[in-house]
Amino acid sequence: MDLPGPRWKKGKDGKDFASLAAANPMSAIVSELKASFISSKPVAILSGPGGSAVLGVGPEQAVILNRAAFGHAIENATAQKHWFQLSPEEVFYLCHALNCIRVDSLDNKQMSEIELWDYFRSGSESFPEMYKAYAHLRLKNWVVRSGLQYGADFVAYRHHPALVHSEFAVVVVPEGAEFGNRCGRLEVWSDLLCALRASGSVAKTLLVLTISSSSKCELSSPDCLEQLVVHERTITRWILQQCREQRCEPSRDEVNREELIIEKESVVFNHWGVILGFTVLSGLLVYRLKFRQ
């Protein structure tokens, strides 16, 4: 069963934004953001026990951050400083993977990557596998946002959410003893059906990311990320009525077979036409000869 393609949004002229996205690939935008942020190293301040952080940037950096689809802009009265609220996965990705921001604690002390990892793990036990899934998609130039409103962990966009609708509802499934009782998601048939129906009702394909370890590792350090492996699986529902009523395009062999049948029928029809015409002419000739006699 073929997966549905991207659903591009349309501008005022009625044309979709596919060409605009192709001219501005997300990989180039993220590279531009990294180059801009490395020189100034903007500071993200942890905002509370939930794990989110607030990042302050200048006007030009705010434009790049918005184009790269990191965080959500916070409205404020000052035009010189722009603030963005970042999720734990976004904070650690900008700090660890891109190495382009600095993170301070609530008491304004700079945090190391290990301290930041421990902080996010204390807020959410599932942070290691969630971050691994987030980074896996981001490194493939997908835009990743929270999928809680769709009954998933994340949703994945082909480009900026202003240009295209999200294609995938992402569910993260950890496997292995190191993940403890967090294993076993979607193993019950009813859970899988619920996830499929929830994603299908909002025109998204269910993408299951299974996180496992290539060797025994400790999740207490970000070094474990190199040993975690991601397996991608898309799951779709086969709807009998829909498949029966949909008209499928015939294959090339079927088209050639139909053309051959039509040619044969045409030859047979022409053959019988010749015989019928000859019979009629013969009858007329015999009739005229009898009439003259």
From Swiss-Prot:
CDD domains: tRNA-intron_lyase_C. It catalyses: pretRNA = a 3'-half-tRNA molecule with a 5'-OH end + a 5'-half-tRNA molecule with a 2',3'-cyclic phosphate end + an intron with a 2',3'-cyclic phosphate and a 5'-hydroxyl terminus. The chain crosses the membrane at residues 267-287. The lineage of its organism: Eukaryota, Viridiplantae, Streptophyta, Embryophyta, Tracheophyta. Constitutes one of the two catalytic subunit of the tRNA-splicing endonuclease complex, a complex responsible for identification and cleavage of the splice sites in pre-tRNA. It cleaves pre-tRNA at the 5'- and 3'-splice sites to release the intron. The products are an intron and two tRNA half-molecules bearing 2',3'-cyclic phosphate and 5'-OH termini. There are no conserved sequences at the splice sites, but the intron is invariably located at the same site in the gene, placing the splice sites an invariant distance from the constant structural features of the tRNA body. This is Probable tRNA-splicing endonuclease subunit Sen2. Gene3D superfamilies: 3.40.1350.10. Pfam families: tRNA_int_endo, tRNA_int_endo_N. It comes from Oryza sativa subsp. japonica (Rice). GO terms for molecular function: lyase activity; nucleic acid binding; tRNA-intron endonuclease activity. It is found in: Nucleus; Membrane. Its main location: nucleus. The keyword Secreted does not apply. It is an enzyme of class 4 (lyase). One of its GO terms (biological process) is tRNA-type intron splice site recognition and cleavage. Its EC number is 4.6.1.16. It is a single-pass membrane protein. The keyword Nucleus applies. InterPro entries: tRNA_endonuc-like_dom_sf, tRNA_intron_Endo_cat-like_sf, tRNA_intron_Endonuc_cat-like, tRNA_intron_Endonuc_N, tRNA_splic. tRNA splicing endonuclease is a heterotetramer composed of SEN2, SEN15, SEN34/LENG5 and SEN54. One of its GO terms (cellular component) is tRNA-intron endonuclease complex. The active site is at residues 157, 165, 204. Keywords: Lyase, Membrane, mRNA processing, Nucleus, Transmembrane, Transmembrane helix, tRNA processing. Belongs to the tRNA-intron endonuclease family.
